[in-house]
Regions:
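Short S/T/G/P-rich N-terminal loop/turn motif that feeds into the first structured element of a domain
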Residues: 1-98, 107-124
Length: 124
């Protein structure tokens, strides 16, 4: 569960930024809701490859940022890798997923999920 992941080059990556509601902080309850959702995805959908949950650490790189940016607010990111965008979308229409994701959305004011194709990857 906390080990390294391997991502095939052909995979698509979905990047979901989940902004927490005003006054909501990272908590065991939120972490449990995210874990429940991740477990549903991992154990149910064959075209799911891997995923990561990232808690915003509160800093913005001045060296790596260009242009205007403001406070990012309290949020977390869900990064998932799938065999296809179509498989991802089908999974997210299923009642089982919608119920689990609803548990996460109880803590969120908004969520936006963007899809990406891998153009380069490497490791050291």
């Amino acid at each position: 569960m906390f080990g390294p992941i391997t991502v095939p080059y052909e995979a698509v990556m979905l990047y979901n930024v989940c902004k927490l509601k005003e006054g909501v902080e990272w908590s065991e309850d939120l972490e449990f809701a995210i874990g429940e959702m991740c477990n549903v995805v991992r154990s149910t959908y064959d075209d799911f490859i891997a995923g990561q949950v990232l808690k915003y650490a509160g800093f913005v790189s001045e060296e790596g940022s260009v242009g205007d940016y403001g406070p990012e607010g309290n949020h977390f990111a869900l990064i998932t890798y799938w065999k296809s965008f179509k498989s991802h979308e089908e999974s997210h229409r299923a009642d089982l997923f919608l119920e689990a994701f609803g548990g996460v959305l109880d803590y969120c004011s908004e969520a936006k999920e963007l899809g990406y194709e891998i153009m380069w990857q490497g490791e050291n």
